[in-house]
Amino acid sequence: MKTFTAKPETVKRDWYVVDANGKTLGRLATELASRLRGKHKAEYTPHVDTGDYIIVLNAEKVAVTGNKRTDKIYYRHTGHIGGIKQATFEEMIARSPERVIEIAVKGMLPKGPLGRAMYRKLKVYAGTEHNHAAQQPQVLDI
């Protein structure tokens, strides 16, 4: 019996919608990253993007445990000398709640072109509305 290898043109990708309301950030992000990679499928192949599209709603209501709401710090750099910026979890949720989930999931995906292709299949929205109704996403309970 020959080893099966998925081909990019034969991969079937589904659309799923996930409600992040009350979900713990890290536990949600690991499941999302696994599904974006396609590890839940029998035809998973490490060097082929076999994952599904995922829409995350209610990003502003994601939960963290302990004191992370005030103690967790996100760093970024402007590119200029002395241009390091920082924001706490609370500030990030207030400014752009989508970025919190995006950053958590992106760090769990492979680095390089394949990881960027997987990351592009993640759609995160702060509220309950999304503009992907035409794709008929199925509800995914995580």
Swiss-Prot record:
**Keywords, sorted A to Z:** Ribonucleoprotein, Ribosomal protein
One GO biological process term: translation
InterPro entries noted in UniProt? Ribosomal_uL13 (IPR005822), Ribosomal_uL13_bac-type (IPR005823), Ribosomal_uL13_CS (IPR023563), Ribosomal_uL13_sf (IPR036899)
Q: Name one GO cellular component term.
A: cytosolic large ribosomal subunit
Task: Say if the entry is tagged with keyword Translocase.
Answer: no
Molecular functions per Gene Ontology? mRNA binding; structural constituent of ribosome
PROSITE patterns named among the record's database cross-references? RIBOSOMAL_L13
**Claim: S-adenosyl-L-methionine is one of the keywords in the record:** no
Q: Which SUPFAM superfamilies match?
A: Ribosomal protein L13 (SSF52161)
Q: How does it assemble?
A: Part of the 50S ribosomal subunit.
Task: Give the family per the record.
Answer: Belongs to the universal ribosomal protein uL13 family.
Give the protein's biological function. This protein is one of the early assembly proteins of the 50S ribosomal subunit, although it is not seen to bind rRNA by itself. It is important during the early stages of 50S assembly.
Give the PANTHER family listed for this entry: LARGE RIBOSOMAL SUBUNIT PROTEIN UL13M, RIBOSOMAL PROTEIN L13
Protein name, UniProt field: Large ribosomal subunit protein uL13
Q: What organism is recorded for this protein?
A: Yersinia enterocolitica serotype O:8 / biotype 1B (strain NCTC 13174 / 8081)
- The gene is rplM
